Amino acid sequence: MGGISIWQLLIIAVIIVLLFGTKKLRGVGSDLGSAVKGFKKAISEDESAKDAKKDADFVPQNLEKKEAETVEKQKQNDKEQA
C-alpha cells in the first residue's frame, strides 16, 4: 500500500532507458564496475603492503642485533689475543 510495487519499479526502469538510452547506461555501468574493481585492488594492495612492511621491519632488527653481537665477540677475541 505505502511501498513501491514491482510494476512501479519496472515503469521507472523503462522511463530511464528511454531517457538515457542503452549505450549511455552501459557506459555508466562499466565505469561504475571498473571503479569498484580499482577500489578493491587498491585496498588489497594496501593490506599486502602493510604485511610486507611488518616482515621487513622484523628482519632488519634481528640482523642489527646479530651484527652487534658479532662485533662484540670480535672485540673480546682481539682483547684475549693481545
From Swiss-Prot:
Keyword annotations: Cell inner membrane, Cell membrane, Membrane, Protein transport, Translocation, Transmembrane, Transmembrane helix, Transport
Q: Name one GO cellular component term.
A: TAT protein transport complex
Q: How does it sit in the membrane?
A: Single-pass membrane protein
**Mind telling me which Gene3D superfamilies this protein's record contains?**
1.20.5.3310
GO molecular function terms attached to this record: protein transmembrane transporter activity
> Does the record bear Glycoprotein in its keywords?
no
Pfam families from the UniProt entry: TatA_B_E
Q: Name one GO biological process term.
A: protein transport by the Tat complex
The transmembrane segments are: 1-21
Source species, domain of life = Bacteria
Function, in words: Part of the twin-arginine translocation (Tat) system that transports large folded proteins containing a characteristic twin-arginine motif in their signal peptide across membranes. TatA could form the protein-conducting channel of the Tat system.
Summarize subunit and interaction data from the UniProt record for this chain.
Answer: The Tat system comprises two distinct complexes: a TatABC complex, containing multiple copies of TatA, TatB and TatC subunits, and a separate TatA complex, containing only TatA subunits. Substrates initially bind to the TatABC complex, which probably triggers association of the separate TatA complex to form the active translocon.
Q: Which family does it belong to?
A: Belongs to the TatA/E family.
Recorded hits in PANTHER family, A to Z, give:
SEC-INDEPENDENT PROTEIN TRANSLOCASE PROTEIN TATA
Name of the molecule in the record:
Sec-independent protein translocase protein TatA
